[in-house]
Amino acid sequence: MMVSLFSQFDSPWLLNIPLVLLALIMPWKLFVSFGPSWAGTRSSRLVYATMETLMSQVMQPLNKLGFRWVVLFSSLMLMLMTLNVIGLFPYTFTPTTQLSMNLGLAVPLWLGTVVYGFRNHPVIALAHLCPEGAPNLLVPVLVVVETLSILMRPLALGLRLTANLTAGHLLMHLISSAVLGLMELSVMLSGITLLLLVFLTMLEIAVALIQGYVFAILVTLYLDENL
């Protein structure tokens, strides 16, 4: 039976029970709970140092008012990085390849920043729709263009994450299939392809981490416009 190339992105089912909730919950079981005995270990210091470095870059565009969002952004970035990396393991499901989940994250976060801006600084928020110094004849057109640009932000945010992860998974699937197919023709050629697959896997791990960082920092930039 031929299996579709995109079947790896289907939500898994077992006995007619959807396992997508299990795929979302299980990664958190991999984290060691914080406690006095864990606070001074090397792994904890590595986690603290890494998160401190990343969050200092993510929160850099914001002023003091934006630092109340640091817990949300750090949790978001850590969750996306974890789900992206775990999805690279065999026989696992990657929730972040589903556009529905990514839009479920992008739309509320984007909408929260927009509502915050219009609620606290309505004049400044409306001023973003028309660049300063624009000709009067172009003002209606620019307002429409800027409005569409703002409305497209959550879609672009979700599509960027989905497309990057989906493309990487498909490429790894194709190359791994080529490795198995070439074993019957040439062991050396199959070994070279396997080496390429190893390098691609390392690249995909980096992409998985970077995409979580990019998602968080773009939401930060959206918030910065409305503070």
Curated annotation (Swiss-Prot):
Domain of life, per lineage: Eukaryota
Molecular function GO terms recorded: proton transmembrane transporter activity
Transmembrane regions: 14-34, 69-89, 98-118, 137-157, 169-189, 205-223
Entry keyword set: ATP synthesis, CF(0), Hydrogen ion transport, Ion transport, Membrane, Mitochondrion, Mitochondrion inner membrane, Transmembrane, Transmembrane helix, Transport
Protein location: Mitochondrion inner membrane
InterPro entries: ATP_synth_F0_asu, ATP_synth_F0_asu_AS, ATP_synth_F0_asu_bact/mt, F0_ATP_A_sf
Gene3D superfamilies xrefs: ATP synthase, F0 complex, subunit A
Main location: mitochondrion
GO CC terms of this entry: mitochondrial inner membrane; proton-transporting ATP synthase complex
Pfam families tied to this protein: ATP-synt_A
GO biological process terms on file: proton motive force-driven ATP synthesis
Bilayer disposition of the protein: Multi-pass membrane protein
Assigned protein family: Belongs to the ATPase A chain family.
Primary role: Mitochondrial membrane ATP synthase (F(1)F(0) ATP synthase or Complex V) produces ATP from ADP in the presence of a proton gradient across the membrane which is generated by electron transport complexes of the respiratory chain. F-type ATPases consist of two structural domains, F(1) - containing the extramembraneous catalytic core and F(0) - containing the membrane proton channel, linked together by a central stalk and a peripheral stalk. During catalysis, ATP synthesis in the catalytic domain of F(1) is coupled via a rotary mechanism of the central stalk subunits to proton translocation.
Subunit structure: F-type ATPases have 2 components, CF(1) - the catalytic core - and CF(0) - the membrane proton channel. CF(1) has five subunits: alpha(3), beta(3), gamma(1), delta(1), epsilon(1). CF(0) has three main subunits: a, b and c.
Protein name (database record): ATP synthase subunit a
Biological source species: Branchiostoma floridae (Florida lancelet)
